[in-house]
A protein has these predicted regions:
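Flexible loop/turn segments at secondary-structure boundaries
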Residues: 1-2, 38-42, 130-132, 198-200, ...
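Short beta-strand-plus-loop segments that form exposed binding edges in beta-rich domains
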Residues: 287-296
């Protein structure tokens, strides 16, 4: 299943592996992409899986790395959507942007949605039902004053439906900081011998070891059947609404102050899920659970209210 990073992941891929020397790099003549179809039931689904990623691959193959520009590619891509519509290609519509899976606001919030494809109509519901062309159309920012669940869906001019997107806007107050005095910098990671596929079951599995880590990641000693429970405190530098981007392969969850903020659970390929939490300045208990059975990936990024990523340093986490 593709996500918001799938297209940029192709465009930003570097085929010149660091392990290759200059003579070996000169032997690379081109690129090839493959699509495994054992779980793809139709030609339409094939088109959905390869377009517009095929365009990103083509530009990656013929462009010198020094002139590559993701923003420039997006500008060129916008001009191709009308052609794809005329050709009736079942391309994957660009992801709706401007929100997280969970969004926090103080007092009054604003729902402001954008889409790279200008030809689509965006419709939405707030009762949990699936949007149709008869549902309210999104025509501009929406003010929210209470916790509200939105379901969005894009529609192409020919009526083709895009992916269903759900997001929650949570009316919040700044969660108070904990009265705690942790003794160590970083986080504690407990590795369980876990063979399941739900984060909630990890605690029941036998423990293989305990590790100290500086950030949310898989300790280098951990391999095979992985069930991780990472605990500690996040040090919020000031009162604010923080965005937490949790990337994992397979499942993961993030709790802050005991509340589920990011739910990226279940078996899946690399996927990033985002959530927000309003936090007062100071220490806040966090818990990340994660599982995988064949290597995997785990990463947490924290952004401030103005979208700036907080650097991982000795003051960010403690336990």
């Amino acid at each position: 299943q593709q996500d918001k990073n799938s297209l940029s992941g192709v465009y930003n891929y570097n085929p010149m592996l660091e392990s290759l020397n200059d003579a070996q790099k000169a032997l690379i003549l081109g690129m090839q992409a493959n699509l495994w179809c054992e779980y793809i039931p139709s030609r339409e689904r094939i088109q959905y899986m390869i377009m517009p990623r095929m365009m990103a691959l083509a530009e990656l193959a013929w462009s010198d790395p020094s002139v590559k520009s993701w923003d420039g590619f997006k500008e060129r891509l916008v001009k191709q959507f009308p052609r794809l519509n005329i050709m009736n290609v079942n391309y994957r519509m660009p992801d709706l942007e401007g929100f997280n899976n969970t969004n926090a606001f103080i007092g009054e919030g604003t729902v402001a949605i954008t889409c790279l494809d200008p030809s689509v109509e965006i419709h939405y519901t707030t009762d949990g039902s699936i949007p149709t062309l008869e549902s309210p159309q999104y025509n501009g920012p929406i003010k929210v004053t209470e916790t509200t669940d939105f379901t969005f869906r894009s529609f192409r001019p020919n009526g083709k439906k895009g992916d269903i997107v759900k997001t929650r806007y949570v009316k919040s107050e700044y969660a108070p900081a904990a009265d705690a005095t942790p003794s160590k910098k970083g986080l504690q990671a407990v590795w369980h011998e876990f063979k399941g596929n739900k984060c909630a079951d990890i605690d029941n599995a036998p423990v293989n070891g305990t590790y100290e880590i500086s950030e949310v990641t898989i300790p280098k000693e951990v391999k095979g059947n992985i069930g991780l429970v990472v605990t500690g405190y996040f040090n919020a530098p000031e009162d604010g609404i923080y965005t937490f981007n949790l990337l994992s392969d397979d499942g993961s969850t993030l709790k802050i102050n005991g509340e589920l903020v990011v739910d990226n659970d279940g078996p899946h390929s690399p996927r990033e899920v985002t959530g927000q939490k309003a936090l007062a300045k100071g220490l806040h208990p966090i818990e990340v659970k994660y599982f995988d059975h064949n290597g995997g990936m785990l990463q947490l990024k924290v952004l401030t209210a103005d979208g700036k990523e907080l650097p991982v340093n000795a003051d960010m986490f403690a336990y």
